[in-house]
Amino acid sequence: MDVEQKKPLIESSDRNLPDFKKSVKLKYVKLGYHYLITHGMYLFLSPLVLVIAAQISTFSVTDLRSLWEHLQYNLISVVVCSMLLVFLMTIYFMTRPRPVYLVNFSCFKPDESRKCTKKIFMDRSKLTGSFTEENLEFQRKILQRSGLGESTYLPEAVLNVPPNPCMKEARKEAETVMFGAIDELLAKTNVNPKDIGILIVNCSLFNPTPSLSAMVVNHYKLRGNILSYNLGGMGCSAGLISIDLAKHLLHSIPNTYAMVISMENITLNWYFGNDRSKLVSNCLFRMGGAAILLSNKRWDRRRSKYELVDTVRTHKGADDKCFGCITQEEDSASKIGVTLSKELMAVAGDALKTNITTLGPLVLPTSEQLLFFATLVGRKLFKMKIKPYIPDFKLAFEHFCIHAGGRAVLDELEKNLKLTEWHMEPSRMTLYRFGNTSSSSLWYELAYSEAKGRIKKGDRIWQIAFGSGFKCNSSVWRAVRSVNPKKEKNPWMDEIHEFPVEVPKVSTI
């Protein structure tokens, strides 16, 4: 057993997220309330309609007869009011956004032959002859503390001896992941591929020609007028960007389906150099992907799992430090890799702070909003020396799907948001079982909650992810129905009885 090193791999000040609740800018709170007011018409009209209905229900027959006689003598007023009512109702039905339902989703589970234990990872890394002994030791220590288990997956091109990363193998990995997830999704939903009107594929680091979305169109012979999008270079939060894009398209195009595929490609993005800031990605990222089917057809509600409540996107790219904290570049030996800067955790904390400050007014109960806002105004405007109030997001959500980017980030989010081990379990178990699957990790986490039988009708789910750019994005879902795990097919079902497991702080290899 190795002796634990005295000095941490990353300095504490760089490793920990800042206490983002202690520094909140009023403009982000204002933005959140702007979103609330924009969608607040329905909130204010609903009680008014209920009051009018309650008042009418108290009328006696004599009152109704008297009202009818009064209307007969004011026919012009009745006609004008009726026309105005019809006009307002028409405007309401024409302008209200169409609901966006998540019919179902699927997560790809690779074959057993692609499993990669920590020992296999270290053995293959050594056999490449690319890494110095010091950097092999560095990777071993990162891997020991990563939170990954012994059953994550890597593509064949990386596991082969010697490795053979090439365009052919990268396409093979992409097709395996995408088509595997889509085949399962179509089988679950019984949707004809020709009925899909919108296709969005996001993959940050692999963008071939023809595009990944074109590969899907060709393989499934999708219709010629499909709206096809291929998002690249947008990092681990790209999955929620795809959901947000699909939402806006579904709000403007009636009666159609949108299919979203979120994945990352490992084959051509394995780093074979000795720059330590690029080696961390090798230790964390693993093979995986997800396919999601969305619908704006109102009759699909009865068979859908979730309804999209809201999305909030935050982009910090205007700040140079944020923009450059995750960069794909060449090292001194001209080998390409993804650099993770020391400022990453601080940047992530700032983006997260902005995102949840904007999201808060949309989801938090009124009591929490008032306490949070009053404390904020007191501290910012009146310079009062009072302790900042940390809203309890557990009052707004029953389930949390936090991007499984790494153990340190999950630890800090658990502490800052005051979440319990139960709330963090889907994220930690996803990181342990599948590793960092980039933008698709959120869906493995939701699948975990479903497999555990936790999703009940009316439950609210918060998905939050962050990635290069720097971006932090959130989506909020409400369960349309309870999910029966016995009827589910997802990558956890055949082994869910083994989880949760205790993940050691430092594992042995």
UniProtKB/Swiss-Prot annotation:
Entries under InterPro entries matching the protein: 3-ktacl-CoA_syn (IPR012392), ACP_syn_III_C (IPR013747), FAE1_typ3_polyketide_synth (IPR013601), Thiolase-like (IPR016039)
Keywords, in A-Z order: Acyltransferase, Membrane, NAD, NADP, Transferase, Transmembrane, Transmembrane helix
Cellular-component GO terms for this entry: membrane
FAE domain: residues covered: 92-381
Coiled-coil regions listed in the entry: none
Catalytic site positions: 236, 315, 399, 403, 436
Compartmental location: Membrane
Keyword Oxidoreductase among record annotations: no
GO molecular function: fatty acid elongase activity
Chief location bin: membrane
Induction of the gene: Repressed by herbicides such as flufenacet and benfuresate. Down-regulated by darkness and low temperature.
Keyword hit for Transit peptide: no
Membrane-spanning intervals of the chain: 36-56, 75-95
Tissue: Only expressed in guard cells. Expressed in siliques, flowers, leaves, stems, roots and seedlings.
Annotated EC: 2.3.1.199
Name listed for the protein in its UniProt record: 3-ketoacyl-CoA synthase 11
Organism whose genome encodes this protein: Arabidopsis thaliana (Mouse-ear cress)
Name of the gene: KCS11
